[in-house]
Protein backbone atom coordinates (compact mmCIF):
# COMPACT_ATOMS: atom_id res chain seq x y z
CA UNK A 1 0.00 0.00 0.00
CA UNK A 2 1.23 3.46 -0.85
CA UNK A 3 2.16 5.71 2.07
CA UNK A 4 0.35 8.60 0.38
CA UNK A 5 -0.97 9.65 -3.00
CA UNK A 6 -3.17 12.24 -4.70
CA UNK A 7 -6.52 11.59 -6.38
CA UNK A 8 -9.68 13.45 -7.39
CA UNK A 9 -11.82 14.44 -4.41
CA UNK A 10 -15.09 13.02 -5.74
CA UNK A 11 -17.04 12.37 -8.91
CA UNK A 12 -18.19 15.54 -10.63
CA UNK A 13 -18.21 17.62 -13.79
CA UNK A 14 -17.24 21.08 -14.96
CA UNK A 15 -17.99 22.84 -18.24
CA UNK A 16 -16.04 25.43 -20.20
CA UNK A 17 -16.74 26.97 -23.62
CA UNK A 18 -13.97 27.55 -26.15
CA UNK A 19 -14.76 29.07 -29.57
CA UNK A 20 -18.44 28.13 -29.14
CA UNK A 21 -17.61 24.46 -28.47
CA UNK A 22 -18.74 23.07 -25.11
CA UNK A 23 -16.16 21.00 -23.25
CA UNK A 24 -17.61 19.13 -20.27
CA UNK A 25 -15.04 17.43 -18.05
CA UNK A 26 -16.32 14.47 -16.04
CA UNK A 27 -14.03 13.12 -13.30
CA UNK A 28 -14.29 10.06 -11.11
CA UNK A 29 -12.16 8.03 -8.75
CA UNK A 30 -11.57 4.47 -10.00
CA UNK A 31 -9.58 1.54 -8.64
CA UNK A 32 -9.68 -0.86 -11.61
CA UNK A 33 -9.66 -0.61 -15.38
CA UNK A 34 -13.14 -2.12 -15.43
CA UNK A 35 -14.42 0.71 -13.23
CA UNK A 36 -12.81 3.22 -15.58
CA UNK A 37 -14.41 1.66 -18.65
CA UNK A 38 -17.80 1.53 -16.93
CA UNK A 39 -17.51 5.23 -16.08
CA UNK A 40 -16.56 6.09 -19.66
CA UNK A 41 -19.49 4.10 -21.05
CA UNK A 42 -21.83 5.76 -18.58
CA UNK A 43 -20.80 9.22 -19.81
CA UNK A 44 -21.05 8.14 -23.45
CA UNK A 45 -24.57 6.90 -22.81
CA UNK A 46 -25.54 10.15 -21.10
CA UNK A 47 -24.03 12.24 -23.90
CA UNK A 48 -24.81 9.94 -26.84
CA UNK A 49 -25.41 12.93 -29.14
CA UNK A 50 -22.10 14.67 -28.34
CA UNK A 51 -19.50 15.16 -31.07
CA UNK A 52 -16.83 13.39 -28.99
CA UNK A 53 -16.39 11.75 -25.59
CA UNK A 54 -12.62 11.55 -25.13
CA UNK A 55 -11.07 9.84 -22.14
CA UNK A 56 -7.94 9.20 -20.09
CA UNK A 57 -7.16 7.40 -16.86
CA UNK A 58 -4.30 6.49 -14.54
CA UNK A 59 -4.63 3.49 -12.23
CA UNK A 60 -2.37 1.58 -9.83
CA UNK A 61 0.32 2.19 -7.25
CA UNK A 62 2.97 2.58 -9.94
CA UNK A 63 0.62 4.07 -12.56
CA UNK A 64 0.97 0.80 -14.47
CA UNK A 65 -2.37 1.33 -16.21
CA UNK A 66 -2.47 4.46 -18.36
CA UNK A 67 -4.90 4.83 -21.23
CA UNK A 68 -5.97 7.68 -23.51
CA UNK A 69 -8.65 7.73 -26.20
CA UNK A 70 -9.31 10.48 -28.77
CA UNK A 71 -12.79 9.20 -29.72
CA UNK A 72 -12.61 10.52 -33.26
CA UNK A 73 -10.58 13.67 -32.68
CA UNK A 74 -7.28 13.87 -34.63
CA UNK A 75 -4.76 11.43 -33.14
CA UNK A 76 -2.98 12.76 -30.06
CA UNK A 77 -5.07 15.93 -29.71
CA UNK A 78 -7.48 14.89 -26.95
CA UNK A 79 -6.82 11.78 -24.85
CA UNK A 80 -3.07 12.30 -24.58
CA UNK A 81 -3.19 15.93 -23.37
CA UNK A 82 -5.88 14.86 -20.89
CA UNK A 83 -3.64 12.07 -19.63
CA UNK A 84 -0.70 14.45 -19.37
CA UNK A 85 -2.66 16.70 -17.01
CA UNK A 86 -3.46 13.74 -14.74
CA UNK A 87 0.20 12.72 -14.72
CA UNK A 88 1.54 16.24 -14.15
CA UNK A 89 -0.83 16.62 -11.20
CA UNK A 90 0.56 13.28 -9.92
CA UNK A 91 -2.93 11.79 -9.63
CA UNK A 92 -3.65 8.10 -9.20
CA UNK A 93 -6.84 6.06 -9.61
CA UNK A 94 -8.47 8.87 -11.57
CA UNK A 95 -10.53 8.78 -14.77
CA UNK A 96 -11.41 11.80 -16.91
CA UNK A 97 -13.91 12.01 -19.76
CA UNK A 98 -14.27 15.22 -21.75
CA UNK A 99 -17.48 15.57 -23.72
CA UNK A 100 -17.33 17.97 -26.64
CA UNK A 101 -20.26 19.54 -28.41
CA UNK A 102 -18.87 21.13 -31.57
CA UNK A 103 -19.71 24.81 -31.89
CA UNK A 104 -18.91 25.30 -35.56
CA UNK A 105 -15.38 26.70 -35.28
CA UNK A 106 -12.44 24.38 -35.91
CA UNK A 107 -9.65 24.72 -33.36
CA UNK A 108 -6.80 23.01 -35.20
CA UNK A 109 -4.46 20.46 -33.63
CA UNK A 110 -2.79 22.91 -31.26
CA UNK A 111 -6.09 24.41 -30.22
CA UNK A 112 -7.57 20.99 -29.49
CA UNK A 113 -4.57 19.97 -27.37
CA UNK A 114 -4.89 23.14 -25.31
CA UNK A 115 -8.67 22.86 -25.03
CA UNK A 116 -8.76 19.28 -23.80
CA UNK A 117 -5.90 19.86 -21.39
CA UNK A 118 -7.54 23.02 -20.06
CA UNK A 119 -10.86 21.22 -19.61
CA UNK A 120 -9.31 18.57 -17.35
CA UNK A 121 -7.13 21.07 -15.49
CA UNK A 122 -10.04 23.39 -14.72
CA UNK A 123 -12.25 20.42 -13.90
CA UNK A 124 -9.75 19.30 -11.25
CA UNK A 125 -9.53 22.82 -9.86
CA UNK A 126 -13.32 22.99 -9.62
CA UNK A 127 -13.99 19.52 -8.17
CA UNK A 128 -10.89 19.34 -6.01
CA UNK A 129 -8.00 17.02 -5.23
CA UNK A 130 -7.22 15.16 -2.01
CA UNK A 131 -4.12 13.57 -0.56
CA UNK A 132 -4.81 10.10 0.81
CA UNK A 133 -2.35 9.27 3.58
CA UNK A 134 -1.99 5.79 5.06
CA UNK A 135 -2.60 5.87 8.81
CA UNK A 136 -2.71 3.35 11.64
CA UNK A 137 -5.65 3.61 14.03
CA UNK A 138 -4.30 3.33 17.57
CA UNK A 139 -6.62 2.29 20.40
CA UNK A 140 -5.88 3.66 23.86
CA UNK A 141 -7.97 2.42 26.80
CA UNK A 142 -7.74 3.96 30.26
CA UNK A 143 -9.62 4.62 33.47
CA UNK A 144 -12.03 7.59 33.37
CA UNK A 145 -9.76 9.57 35.67
CA UNK A 146 -7.50 10.01 32.61
CA UNK A 147 -10.27 11.24 30.28
CA UNK A 148 -9.59 14.97 30.47
CA UNK A 149 -5.81 14.75 30.42
CA UNK A 150 -5.59 12.31 27.50
CA UNK A 151 -8.19 14.17 25.42
CA UNK A 152 -6.54 17.56 25.97
CA UNK A 153 -3.05 16.25 25.24
CA UNK A 154 -4.21 14.44 22.08
CA UNK A 155 -5.97 17.53 20.72
CA UNK A 156 -2.81 19.59 21.24
CA UNK A 157 -0.49 16.94 19.76
CA UNK A 158 0.51 16.20 16.17
CA UNK A 159 -1.73 13.12 16.28
CA UNK A 160 -5.33 13.25 15.08
CA UNK A 161 -8.04 12.15 17.50
CA UNK A 162 -10.64 10.15 15.57
CA UNK A 163 -13.20 9.18 18.17
CA UNK A 164 -13.81 8.61 21.89
CA UNK A 165 -15.76 5.57 23.09
CA UNK A 166 -17.35 5.49 26.53
CA UNK A 167 -17.87 2.07 28.10
CA UNK A 168 -16.35 0.36 31.15
CA UNK A 169 -13.20 2.35 30.38
CA UNK A 170 -12.74 5.30 28.06
CA UNK A 171 -11.17 4.42 24.70
CA UNK A 172 -9.52 6.83 22.30
CA UNK A 173 -9.11 6.08 18.59
CA UNK A 174 -6.26 8.08 17.10
CA UNK A 175 -4.87 8.36 13.57
CA UNK A 176 -1.11 7.83 13.65
CA UNK A 177 1.34 7.57 10.77
CA UNK A 178 2.81 4.06 10.59
CA UNK A 179 6.33 5.33 11.24
CA UNK A 180 5.10 7.11 14.39
CA UNK A 181 3.31 4.21 16.10
CA UNK A 182 6.19 3.37 18.45
CA UNK A 183 6.66 7.02 19.35
CA UNK A 184 2.92 7.34 20.00
CA UNK A 185 2.90 4.29 22.29
CA UNK A 186 5.89 5.56 24.26
CA UNK A 187 4.38 9.04 24.55
CA UNK A 188 1.00 7.71 25.73
CA UNK A 189 2.61 5.32 28.21
CA UNK A 190 4.62 8.16 29.72
CA UNK A 191 1.59 10.47 29.71
CA UNK A 192 -0.51 7.98 31.72
CA UNK A 193 2.30 6.66 33.91
CA UNK A 194 1.87 3.27 32.29
CA UNK A 195 -1.81 3.09 33.26
CA UNK A 196 -3.23 2.82 29.73
CA UNK A 197 -3.65 -0.10 27.37
CA UNK A 198 -2.43 0.71 23.85
CA UNK A 199 -3.15 -1.48 20.84
CA UNK A 200 -2.57 -1.14 17.12
CA UNK A 201 -5.69 -1.17 14.97
CA UNK A 202 -6.31 -1.31 11.24
CA UNK A 203 -4.57 0.60 8.49
CA UNK A 204 -6.75 3.10 6.68
CA UNK A 205 -6.41 6.07 4.36
CA UNK A 206 -7.11 9.52 5.73
CA UNK A 207 -8.08 12.14 3.14
CA UNK A 208 -7.09 15.78 3.22
CA UNK A 209 -8.01 18.43 0.66
CA UNK A 210 -5.05 20.04 -1.08
CA UNK A 211 -5.03 23.45 -2.72
CA UNK A 212 -1.92 23.04 -4.81
CA UNK A 213 0.16 20.13 -6.06
CA UNK A 214 3.64 20.69 -7.40
CA UNK A 215 3.46 19.43 -10.97
CA UNK A 216 6.03 17.05 -12.43
CA UNK A 217 8.13 18.19 -15.35
From Swiss-Prot:
Entry's Gene Ontology cellular component terms: cytoplasm
GO biological process: regulation of translational initiation
Pfam families: DUF1949, UPF0029
Cysteine-cysteine disulfides: none
Residues annotated as transmembrane: none
Family indicated by similarity: Belongs to the IMPACT family.
Protein name according to UniProt: IMPACT family member YvyE
Organism expressing this protein natively: Bacillus subtilis (strain 168)
Lineage: Bacteria, Bacillati, Bacillota, Bacilli, Bacillales
Gene that encodes the chain: yvyE
